């Protein structure tokens, strides 16, 4: 009998993960892997004994089996499998939807190797988040749920005697490996990519051998080296997701706010999209949910100055807890405060004429850093001074009223009377400002200094304003294959129209992740690939935020499929929607991609390029666009080239699989027995379109898969099993776990998605997913939005 107080074999998957998180160990993998890892850690804690030995570890079935009959073991195993399946069923069903989407989506057909490669990349992208422990990441849950069902469920179904014989030998091998890794806290950014053979051997040692044989091509958890899995590959994976759902409804327009334009405040136009500004425009924070925790967010004040001696105050109100991001090597909280020109970017201190003082006690300008002043923290107040009355413009700071001296000196000739604007850059922090609106400042200021709000209006300079109406806003969608020259065109066009466009592309997202000091930390620890994987995920949510803003945008992505074009442009209803097609000659395209591969390395596998060629569709004015521009080949020539590409794709790739039309699958259970009884027939996890009481023994348990036409919560809102009526919960009532409201019925449309009912399940905030439309906007209308805690941020279309 093990001396450990934790009996590992009796823990569910969620409990195993919780125990592993307490010990700062990785919680990814199949249930067998989690059990081995936890048991090894427990053995080490108990005194460094071997991780798994027959008769000594709590996982050994031999001692327990002696006191129970075989039938009892089978019943316990079946009950455990059902409980685990209930926990993970939604994730598994979501995983099935992913597979169907891959088959039916814009990617077309692919051979078995290509499909495995996609699944492995999707797993790498979202499962091993390398330090980014994201509870809301639906793709990570898919991998865990599907993996646990496929692996652990097979183990549970083994006869007790066979299980007892197999486990000791399995545990010894896996336990030694786990023991070696659990000697200290493990950074989850560290990822080991094992060769396919070794990885398969590990899975078989974990009890997943039968599943691999039965599953055929569905090999989950197999990781492969990714020589050609760079930025382009993750963009390609993200782009395919647009083929899986119906076109979204246009977002609800923002309410027109009547705000006194003479007041100095944070400017809602001159800020990042993910910079959350309060309604009074005097406080703000960066978004922190999901992958946004990696991004820096900044904004400027509405007015700047070019004369006198002026100041403003900034208080760090909170370092927002980022519970889904754990790392001991990366600074996850930071604030920079200072001044910049209106032509400068939002990354304070990363350009010329952009001056910032950091929470770490560092001053930064044009990516050059130097120690300055003191470090500051929560509840500290930083006063920023700009003195234009000396021979050189002097920028200085004070911490809690204590002068820190001059930080920057700027030549007036170089500055050329251009105004400087208050500017802040946040990384998982919340701040508030005093531009002079307070009757009494946080700390006294020199008598000869004036708050910027108190400077006469004629001596202040208003920052640039955005379009007044949505009809005046412009969105330009780039369309073209990877490496065709889209970004080159965007860079040139933006330079010809300075300050007009917000560019939404992977490059811009990466820039907001890799601020100079942070970039160096990531490079030193070898974690840049984490950002590379997260950037395309953020970009999709950026586009949804952008559709609510009155600005001009350029979408710098491939957008080759008709589905991606349609679904993105549907969000921008009311905008001037334009398309720019970059389609060079085939010879030119080959030269460009070869040159790019020589400089940046190959980042997209050949089969992915072939799929994109096969799905390349030229846009039409009548559909989603008001205007279409062809940069190189014109429409007729481009159409001929695309026909050539489609033939090339068709010959190189296997025949396209038959698409799922959405009809019900035939019931494989021909017995016709009670399908809502656990004991026989189909368990009724999903797929039934229940319109009335056509079932036995009262209403079935609320297992989360029946189409109730929106009348009741789905997951856990009402429990019950067997003949218990649906109003009676099986256990603790958690309406709206956050999965699809129709989670499991074969007709997956028609109802709002992800997070429809309960907004606070398990403390994950107000909306697990980001596609719920009605709930989020109601929340905004009810005035609850700014009452939320910052760490409860979960993006949805009405969020912001």
UniProtKB/Swiss-Prot annotation:
GO terms for biological process: adaptive thermogenesis; cardiac muscle cell development; cell division; cellular response to glucocorticoid stimulus; cellular response to leukemia inhibitory factor; circadian regulation of gene expression; CRD-mediated mRNA stabilization; dendritic transport of messenger ribonucleoprotein complex. The modification Phosphotyrosine is found at residue 242. One of its GO terms (cellular component) is ribonucleoprotein complex. Residues 587-602 are annotated as: Actin-binding. Residues 626-653 form a coiled coil. Disruption phenotype: Mice exhibit early embryonic lethality between 9.5 and 11.5 dpc. Mice show retarded development of embryonic ectoderm at 6.5 dpc and growth retardation beginning at 7.5 dpc. This is Heterogeneous nuclear ribonucleoprotein U. It comes from Mus musculus (Mouse). The gene is Hnrnpu.
